[in-house]
Design a protein with these regions (language model features):
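The feature marks the mature, well-folded catalytic cores of soluble enzymes
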Residues: 1-330
Length: 330
């Protein structure tokens, strides 16, 4: 797992202090199952982090500390995408990160894929199409490992708001996904959840839990802003097929009650869980649906330990567990 320890207080205005302890819990629940590559800003930053991890009895022998000065900590979107070729070789694909076509502070993050792949000795392939370096964040797609990818029109096709690749069509994206990710089948949902500053990332919305099963969030309150859009996405899934021509199993996941802070609706969603080799970390929100969501996800992953991570403070940064972590295949 690739993580970057936060150092930018502006990502969690007024709530930065508890974020360090949330990250401590995250690392603590990953290291029993796989190594962590932990990106830190400096030698002093690393010392402070090690002190916190030791206080929490985290096995730091399972952590590789890498010094690189990032802008932000959202590894899902700024890290390279890893693929395995037909011979089983792991390669890294570099999709361009531009701050979700919204923020200006991404000039350091754009060099992260090169730093990481040099550090771990993997080949880095720049995703080029029509003489352009394709912009794509890891949180905007989810795959089943067999050739099917799910994404949203809101994120990739909006031609006015947070435009990633001006002029790109569904056909263009299908070509890019096929060439660089081996994708033969693309599922297009419509809109993401309310409060998501990425403008429609699918990892808050709909996730594969195995090659044949999709977990999608559902809002039952007709007065909630998410109600119409989320139910529309569920309707879209009724007619889709996988790469093998079969219909997927669809499981619905509840949404927590609307979570607000400082007059902002936050993108709280149980779908932003993170899968490790032996555990599944699920964001929880002090909500009545926490237990229900943990139960549903536990049934989807019977061989993994499902662990709730308190994310009320974390989501003030407008993302949670899947957003901040990135898997690296062995």
């Amino acid at each position: 797992t690739i993580l970057a320890w936060p150092h930018n207080p502006n990502d969690w205005p007024g709530k930065f202090s508890p974020i360090n302890w949330v990250y401590t819990e995250i690392v603590k629940n990953i290291v029993p199952y796989e190594r962590v590559r932990l990106i830190v800003k400096s030698v002093d930053h690393e010392k402070r982090i090690k002190s916190m991890l030791n206080k929490a009895h985290v096995d730091i022998s399972q952590i590789d500390f890498l010094q690189f000065d990032t802008d932000r900590s959202w590894m899902r979107d700024s890290s390279p995408s890893f693929i395995k070729d037909s011979k089983g070789n792991v390669k890294a694909v570099h999709f361009l990160f531009n701050g979700w076509a919204k923020y200006d502070n991404w000039k350091k993050d754009v060099f992260l894929p090169e730093f990481l792949t040099q550090t771990i000795n993997k080949k880095l392939i720049a995703a080029k199409y029509k003489n352009r370096h394709v912009v794509l964040e890891g949180g905007s797609i989810d795959v089943n490992g067999k050739g099917t990818l799910v994404t949203t029109e809101e994120c990739l096709l909006d031609d006015k708001i947070q435009v990633r690749n001006p002029g790109f069509s569904k056909t263009d994206y299908s070509e890019v996904f096929k060439k660089y990710l081996g994708i033969s089948n693309v599922i297009w949902l419509n809109k993401g959840i309310t409060g998501d500053d990425t403008h429609g990332h699918v990892d808050d919305l709909c996730r594969f839990v195995n090659p044949n099963t999709l977990l999608i969030v559902k809002e039952d309150n007709p007065k909630d802003d998410n109600y119409y859009n989320l139910n529309e996405n569920i309707e879209i899934l009724q007619d889709i097929k996988l790469e093998n021509g079969k219909k997927p199993e669809i499981i619905t996941l509840p949404m927590p009650s609307a979570l607000w802070f400082d007059k902002m609706r936050l993108p709280a969603s149980y779908a932003n869980f993170y899968i490790t080799n032996g555990s599944v970390l699920v964001p929880t929100f002090n909500d009545g649906n926490d237990r229900k969501a943990l139960g549903i996800i536990s049934e989807c992953f019977p061989t993994r330990k499902v662990i709730g991570i308190h994310a009320v403070d974390l989501v003030w940064g407008l993302g949670t567990l899947h957003c901040l972590a990135h898997e690296e295949p062995a």
